[in-house]
């Protein structure tokens, strides 16, 4: 059986269907992680993240 560390508390989590919150060990750790994303403490790196700030980018798709 494969075990992975919980991304929040590092507790060992078995990677099986019965592990309801995998890769998290509990609902609490799952919600802590969600809160970090919602508070923008975590982000996926991207070269195009600032496209909205670029005046040269067309916004034809936006509703006016």
Swiss-Prot record:
Q: Which SUPFAM superfamilies match?
A: Glucocorticoid receptor-like (DNA-binding domain)
Q: Which cysteines are joined by disulfide bonds?
A: none
Question: Secretion signal: which residues?
Answer: none
What GO molecular functions are on record for this protein? DNA topoisomerase type II (double strand cut, ATP-hydrolyzing) inhibitor activity; zinc ion binding
The prosthetic group or cofactor this protein requires is: Zn(2+)
Family the entry assigns: Belongs to the DNA gyrase inhibitor YacG family.
Assembly and interaction partners: Interacts with GyrB.
NCBIfam families (UniProt xref)? PRK00418.1
What's this protein's name? DNA gyrase inhibitor YacG
